[in-house]
């Protein structure tokens, strides 16, 4: 990380403050926030349970499990656990509403949709979808579940908007495990990229965007890039360092006069990068106002990439970035895009950094909204918990921006009109039934949101 950025980060952390006015009326605002999401739930009990569970997710509980949330309300844990793991309610309408709300709030025509997998380490073999697979959190192959997430990023902010649980092929073929975990019969094996395309088809229209981005797991298959191209989407996807590319801008080998005209050979993208002269790199000062400087260097070039079947892909733009680390080494990232070659380096950099910033979404959701705190094993419980956690994270996102951009006291009186509805669903005395270490969540959200939006000047 740039030292100037570290210094600015320390200053902002010292300045972060949550006032009592910001916390006052929090639960009535949460109730109002949840109303459009819970319209698809039938019956008052489900709505009340959803409110209780979401309240627990934004609370100061150390472990935001169903059991912990039940204890928060001094209730029998079976009621909460039944709501999450057994009650038949469809989570998809809530996620569609979430995408629409995020798209409306953060709306920018050149927004970025980001796909990113995230793993949850698990012990045993009973949790739905658990298998030995790559776990980024641990940096190795481990026993874990993997969710594929869809996020939306603009200069204003960014948020997770949808998710799918990746079900390994070994699971889809095992009838016993499927039955025990309650996997619906309609669920067939789908690759992580197919899950991403499903979410794009479902929510893409609600998220104004001109870019699709993702990490090197998403960018590796040429077939996924082809699908996006076919859909008319413009992408900037990270690719692994061993991706084979051919420089189509380089001079061709001399023709011998016989046979086919020679072409430049395919080489690894990191080897191609290593041969670049120093003057090939352009310095870009990525600024986000008061939120700290970030200096990177970048290069772009038209290339063709080798496909998995050994064929030659269409022309794409190779975009490279490097950032100097504290030890004076460089962190290198490699991307392929179907954008026009004349797209400015600064625009490619904006999209690349927006994709990286989604990691902050995971940190918030896991650290403050209990995304990974679940202790459930079956299919619907995983999706129910994940859905409500994404809603909780989005609520905290909104609260952080409300506290930063407006006078919190102006909003307190606005909750009076809904107090009667709120009293039916939550305890009258917030301080008694709801632990307000939620302040920690809002401080953290304010601090991270201060760092996230990117603009270029």
Give each language-model segment a name.
Residues 2-4, 9-213, 217-244, 251, ...:
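Conserved, well-structured functional cores that handle cations and Mg-NTP chemistry
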Residues 16-26, 111, 348-364:
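An acidic intrinsically disordered interaction segment
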Residues 31, 156-181, 185, 189, ...:
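An anionic, glycine-rich sequence signature occurring as long contiguous blocks
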Residues 146, 357, 387-390:
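Catalytic-loop motifs flanking and including active-site residues across diverse enzymes
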Residues 150, 199-200, 365, 391-395:
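Buried hydrophobic packing segments
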Residues 337, 343-352, 367-383, 403:
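Short, solvent-exposed helix-loop connector elements
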Residues 341, 354-358, 363, 367, ...:
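Short, well-ordered loop/turn and helix-capping segments at boundaries between secondary-structure elements
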Residues 371-430:
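Basic, amphipathic alpha-helical segments enriched in Lys/Arg and hydrophobic/aromatic residues
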């Amino acid at each position: 990380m740039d030292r100037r950025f570290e210094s600015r980060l320390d200053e902002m952390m010292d300045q972060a403050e949550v006032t009592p006015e910001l916390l006052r009326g929090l639960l009535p605002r949460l109730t109002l926030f949840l109303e459009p999401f819970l319209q698809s739930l039938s019956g008052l009990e489900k709505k009340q349970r959803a409110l209780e569970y979401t309240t627990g997710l934004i609370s100061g509980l150390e472990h935001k499990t169903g059991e912990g949330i039940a204890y928060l309300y001094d209730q029998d844990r079976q009621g909460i656990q039944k709501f999450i793991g057994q009650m038949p309610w469809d989570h998809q309408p809530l996620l569609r509403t979430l995408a629409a709300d995020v798209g409306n709030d953060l709306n920018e025509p050149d927004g970025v949709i980001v796909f990113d997998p995230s793993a949850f380490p698990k012990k045993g073999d009973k949790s739905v979808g658990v298998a030995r697979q790559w776990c980024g959190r641990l940096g190795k192959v481990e026993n874990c579940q993997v969710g594929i997430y869809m996020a939306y990023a603009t200069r204003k902010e960014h948020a997770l908007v949808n998710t799918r649980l990746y079900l390994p092929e070994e699971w889809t073929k095992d009838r016993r495990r499927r039955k025990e975990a309650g996997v619906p019969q309609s669920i067939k094996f789908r690759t992580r990229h197919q899950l991403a395309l499903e979410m794009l088809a479902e929510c893409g229209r609600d998220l104004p965007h001109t870019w699709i981005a993702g990490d090197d797991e998403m960018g590796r298959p040429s077939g996924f890039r082809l699908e996006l191209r076919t859909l008319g989407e413009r992408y900037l996807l990270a690719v692994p360092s061993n991706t084979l590319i051919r420089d189509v801008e380089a001079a061709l080998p001399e023709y011998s006069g016989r046979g086919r005209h020679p072409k430049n050979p395919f080489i690894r993208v990191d080897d191609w990068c290593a041969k670049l002269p120093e003057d090939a790199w352009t310095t870009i000062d990525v600024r986000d106002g008061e939120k700290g400087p970030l200096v990177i260097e970048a290069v772009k070039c038209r290339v063709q990439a080798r496909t998995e079947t050994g064929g030659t892909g269409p022309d794409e733009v190779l975009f490279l970035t490097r950032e100097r680390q504290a030890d004076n080494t460089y962190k290198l990232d490699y991307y392929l895009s179907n954008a026009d070659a004349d797209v400015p380096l600064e625009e490619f950099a904006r999209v690349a950094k927006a994709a990286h910033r989604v990691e902050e979404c995971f940190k918030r959701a896991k650290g403050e909204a209990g995304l990974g705190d679940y202790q459930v094993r079956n299919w619907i419980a995983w999706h129910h918990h994940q859905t409500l956690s994404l809603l909780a994270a989005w609520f905290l996102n909104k609260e952080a921006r409300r506290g930063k951009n407006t006078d919190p006291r102006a909003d307190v009186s606005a909750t009076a009109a809904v107090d009667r509805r709120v009293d039916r669903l939550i305890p009258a005395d917030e301080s008694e039934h709801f632990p307000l270490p939620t302040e920690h969540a809002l401080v953290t959200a304010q601090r991270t949101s201060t760092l996230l939006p990117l603009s270029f000047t």
